[in-house]
Amino acid sequence: MAQSLRLHFAARRSNTYPLSETSGDDLDSHVHMCFKRPTRISTSNVVQMKLTPRQTALAPLIKENVQSQERSSVPSSENVNKKSSCLQISLQPTRYSGYLQSSNVLADSDDASFTCILKDGIYSSAVVDNELNAVNDGHLVSSPAICSGSLSNFSTSDNGSYSSNGSDFGSCASITSGGSYTNSVISDSSSYTFPPSDDTFLGGNLPSDSTSNRSVPNRNTTPCEIFSRSTSTDPFVQDDLEHGLEIMKLPVSRNTKIPLKRYSSLVIFPRSPSTTRPTSPTSLCTLLSKGSYQTSHQFIISPSEIAHNEDGTSAKGFLSTAVNGLRLSKTICTPGEVRDIRPLHRKGSLQKKIVLSNNTPRQTVCEKSSEGYSCVSVHFTQRKAATLDCETTNGDCKPEMSEIKLNSDSEYIKLMHRTSACLPSSQNVDCQININGELERPHSQMNKNHGILRRSISLGGAYPNISCLSSLKHNCSKGGPSQLLIKFASGNEGKVDNLSRDSNRDCTNELSNSCKTRDDFLGQVDVPLYPLPTENPRLERPYTFKDFVLHPRSHKSRVKGYLRLKMTYLPKTSGSEDDNAEQAEELEPGWVVLDQPDAACHLQQQQEPSPLPPGWEERQDILGRTYYVNHESRRTQWKRPTPQDNLTDAENGNIQLQAQRAFTTRRQISEETESVDNRESSENWEIIREDEATMYSNQAFPSPPPSSNLDVPTHLAEELNARLTIFGNSAVSQPASSSNHSSRRGSLQAYTFEEQPTLPVLLPTSSGLPPGWEEKQDERGRSYYVDHNSRTTTWTKPTVQATVETSQLTSSQSSAGPQSQASTSDSGQQVTQPSEIEQGFLPKGWEVRHAPNGRPFFIDHNTKTTTWEDPRLKIPAHLRGKTSLDTSNDLGPLPPGWEERTHTDGRIFYINHNIKRTQWEDPRLENVAITGPAVPYSRDYKRKYEFFRRKLKKQNDIPNKFEMKLRRATVLEDSYRRIMGVKRADFLKARLWIEFDGEKGLDYGGVAREWFFLISKEMFNPYYGLFEYSATDNYTLQINPNSGLCNEDHLSYFKFIGRVAGMAVYHGKLLDGFFIRPFYKMMLHKPITLHDMESVDSEYYNSLRWILENDPTELDLRFIIDEELFGQTHQHELKNGGSEIVVTNKNKKEYIYLVIQWRFVNRIQKQMAAFKEGFFELIPQDLIKIFDENELELLMCGLGDVDVNDWREHTKYKNGYSANHQVIQWFWKAVLMMDSEKRIRLLQFVTGTSRVPMNGFAELYGSNGPQSFTVEQWGTPEKLPRAHTCFNRLDLPPYESFEELWDKLQMAIENTQGFDGVD
């Protein structure tokens, strides 16, 4: 991740011209701020950012003659910053009045000082050498003194604000605007005391030479008056900039490596949010002595020395001036701690005054202005007592007095952004203004220490010809200070330079009465950092902003509005070796930089991307992911297109054909039963090779008993294991046969070997009859017997012994081929001899037979049905391996009071008349002492589907066919008009007859299937805005909650899509669209749980899971939720009055439920209702409920052929598993033994969808992008496998046998809702 984070504030931005990359004078007129995140890492999760837009009144003018000289140093210390994943931004505003006049100030960053250019009418004072200019004719003369040991200066803002700065082994800076007044004095060894007096105001810096240590006797110390003449109350205009400017400089560091970018004023507070409610801004009581408050316009500077002031006398002075009722908290700050400062509003007119004295320990500030406004306060101290060096007349020191009058008629300046900072690493002592207007010093001792500037301050506003830049730099490893760089760029630099040479200018400044303001909390936002893009410096930055809803700090806060930000990561550049060394030094021990890009990655990242081909557009979805839209073909893709990749029509057709081929391979599970009426007809049997027949003949016996030549399970298990080990990776995948008679047929498509001679054919055999014999009944009900061996019939029941010899003879004759007689004889014995053994393991009423090609199938005489699936797989492994059980597998009679019945869909269930309850499990299997645990209910999707097809009856009062004539170029629009034009939806149940314009042909099913493919690609295309890709991948869909903004008739289109989906299900066709799991649950009217969110949005899921498992009270969450729409964030209440309800342990489950309902149900309720209205017009709602959400996906989208070779090749193993591990070998053996349905169900269990990407498992997606299928060792053999759908990971315990793995895996797949198997 890039180390620099760029934040842009869009406060009425008018120009967006790029800035120079070097710090100079060529600044634009906008607000900028750069915060460089340090590589020094801690363990915090929140970085608090405060933005404080302020405004104060425009001050009138005061003239003075000064001469400026200054020097200053800012000590440095090590900054310790915290690692963050979220920015918490707090806003602190002030009431605004007036507007900012056009004025410009220019500063040179190369000069080690802060330059402030003043105009006529703006007060400025500087430093003179050991002299104090007198006041003549009522004009103000400021006389600060400065020598080698003490430095100070005064700086003013561009609109009449007054600030001062002086430092020597202690730094102080104070900046205000709009007439607000602050004063700061820092001295190396001087101390000042001021006697109380009325109508006095400190108007200048009073430092002294630290080496002279002079003192002024009390008899010579008279108040220094500073008179103000209201000579002009005219507004401050732009023309005044052209003459009468004063330059003052504040020292800054030269070593700043951050280029000038477009930023705004921000301050980062690396501390947790406030837990103590701040005092009311209108309260007259004092602040608490301790507590953590959100700051408001405050600098804290570490004290040089804490003074004792207990007995009313002071040996060491402390001075801080506040204006208009600004109250400073009396407290001692810990490093990084910031106190709250609020303006004190009082009635009546107070006059500001500061009383100076030599023998009093108190410094007082009284205010008598009825119009108060807040300002910046600087906390600092002085160390030793020193005398005031001033110019005297006739041996007397006559400091002047000044009375400042406030005029409420003056014009004001509006400052849009304002920052504050915290600095000290030692204890700080603040002054507090009591209700009498006195500034009291705390009774604490100040320790000697350097003042450290730890953050930067800047003023800015989005106004013409004014810009402000604040650059914040961290030098953690070398202990360097944060650097302050404030620049005011004027539109006419030449005139400024000429005027800056004149150091003696007369300035007049009038302070007027300002209206009452209050400094209140605007709100705070949490900004996620993970989806932020990285900026390319070679390209023009797209100024796309996001609006974040302002949240309250506590339940008593009332906030409203948005914070608009544009944030990007600054790209890493190939910096010097010193920069890399600094980054290495700044890392704390124990931290390692991961995913460090190499030089090639750097070069690739810095390469300028090629322009998009014509007709392409770059966009971003709601998750910040970039995708590209092809307006010519109306397609979207994730990969950036290039002119070389611009596909021709033929290549596009090939891709379309490939997608269609993948779609056509999907099928319904019982398609073969719909077209085949006579199963026993010889021409309907499928030709199958020996390897397939061998694999399926007795797959239920993987656990071999002791060696026996007639043991079929032993031979099959050994052969299957050998093939998995030897030929598993080299087998060639072949397409499935066009005659899909069995769902199990697709499971062997990945393994094709050399043709082998077929096994001896064992013809259909009835139970209790010799092989090849079958019992049938004639029309009168008489039984007769058919000998398929000789193709004869007889009324006499044949004996078993006579037919065994015939079977052996037939087997040896039919096995003639390249194999030896010995192997032929063995093969014949393997098939013919264990007939009773095979049937002995079958359940009661079942029989196994073989097709002419040797493929076994099973007959259930209880229900008179046949199946390719071995029913023995449904018996627990420990039962299958026990030969001591009865050969008929008869578990005995049912317990007393029980009854066995068959459901309407063919499933067997049991009735307990004792307690009047029903269940699917056989009660005889509940006797653990005899048979072990009960067999869980297995969802038989095939039976459900067949029952569903039987219930769908065609109505008689509809036409024979439903015709549609369409154009391929406008298939969506033509289909919409034709289908929605049908008033009676039953007409859509007629046979489909589709013709494409300009094409001749008869539609006997193939054209309709192609139409469903084409219409699916159009309906579910995110280009039209009706659907969008889910958060986890780019092939599962969800309804776009903002579809109404893309299409006014979106509800009509959703009804159309519902009708098309119903037509596909009714006619047995498929849709090429896969939805998220909550979509299918909503169709079935099932409740959506927290587990369903994991596969859709893992970040959201983890947040809600944390709330469920922890106490959310400290998060200060409300029953509200934010939604982003086109860059703006909107706020929705989850319940009435939700913004006032705090989420606690008692109501957190309700909160999670409401969040899930809003996320999946409420936002798309209208769209989903329209879709279900169209769907249920063709499919009965009660009939569809026999399926679960996974089976409903198979019903709508069909079963696909899973390439096991590709699946296995792109699977990863973790935590001790490897490709050669025994459990992994058993796992893939189980996958091979599964039919297509079971494989799809396994895929759904692990990944959440039955669809495999077009290019195979290599492009399988997870919640964080491409994520391969993973099998990880976890748990103990007693546990069931579990899945993580967001990571495509299967947690597989190390089972001790294949039978145990098979049982547990089947149970997990079939009963995912019955246990916590997916998390």
Curated annotation (Swiss-Prot):
Major site of localization recorded for this protein: cytoplasm
Q: Which residues form the WW domain?
A: 610-643, 767-800, 840-873, 892-925
Q: Which UniProt keywords apply?
A: Acetylation, Cell membrane, Cytoplasm, Host-virus interaction, Isopeptide bond, Membrane, Neurogenesis, Nucleus, Phosphoprotein, Repeat, Transferase, Ubl conjugation, Ubl conjugation pathway
Q: Which reaction does it catalyse?
A: S-ubiquitinyl-[E2 ubiquitin-conjugating enzyme]-L-cysteine + [acceptor protein]-L-lysine = [E2 ubiquitin-conjugating enzyme]-L-cysteine + N(6)-ubiquitinyl-[acceptor protein]-L-lysine
Q: What is its EC number?
A: 2.3.2.26
PTM note: Undergoes 'Lys-29'-linked auto-ubiquitination at Lys-1279 and serves as a scaffold for recruiting USP13 to form an NEDD4-USP13 deubiquitination complex.
User: What Pfam families does the database record attribute to this sequence?
Assistant: HECT, WW
Q: Where is this region: Mediates interaction with TNIK?
A: 578-981
**Low complexity compositional bias, start-end:** 810-825
- GO CC term, one of those recorded: perinuclear region of cytoplasm
Instruction: Tell me what controls its activity.
Output: Activated by NDFIP1- and NDFIP2-binding.
Region annotation Disordered: residue ranges?
Answer: 204-229, 755-780, 796-834
List residues of the HECT domain.
Answer: 984-1318
Q: Which effect does the record note for changing residue 627 to H?
A: In a breast cancer sample; somatic mutation
Q: Where is this motif: Nuclear export signal?
A: 716-726
- Membrane protein topology class: Peripheral membrane protein
**SMART domains the UniProt entry points to:** HECTc, WW
SUPFAM superfamilies on file = Hect, E3 ligase catalytic domain (SSF56204), WW domain (SSF51045)
What function does this protein fulfil? Answer: E3 ubiquitin-protein ligase which accepts ubiquitin from an E2 ubiquitin-conjugating enzyme in the form of a thioester and then directly transfers the ubiquitin to targeted substrates. Specifically ubiquitinates 'Lys-63' in target proteins. Involved in the pathway leading to the degradation of VEGFR-2/KDFR, independently of its ubiquitin-ligase activity. Monoubiquitinates IGF1R at multiple sites, thus leading to receptor internalization and degradation in lysosomes. Ubiquitinates FGFR1, leading to receptor internalization and degradation in lysosomes. Promotes ubiquitination of RAPGEF2. (Microbial infection) Involved in the ubiquitination of Ebola virus protein VP40 which plays a role in viral budding.
Q: How is the subunit organization of this protein annotated in UniProt?
A: Binds, in vitro, through the WW2 and WW3 domains, to neural isoforms of ENAH that contain the PPSY motif. Interacts with BEAN1, LITAF, RNF11, WBP1, WBP2, PMEPAI and PRRG2. Interacts with NDFIP1 and NDFIP2; this interaction activates the E3 ubiquitin-protein ligase and may induce its recruitment to exosomes. Interacts with UBE2D2. Interaction with PTEN is questionable according to PubMed:18562292. Interacts (via C2 domain) with GRB10 (via SH2 domain). Interacts with ERBB4.
Protein known as: E3 ubiquitin-protein ligase NEDD4
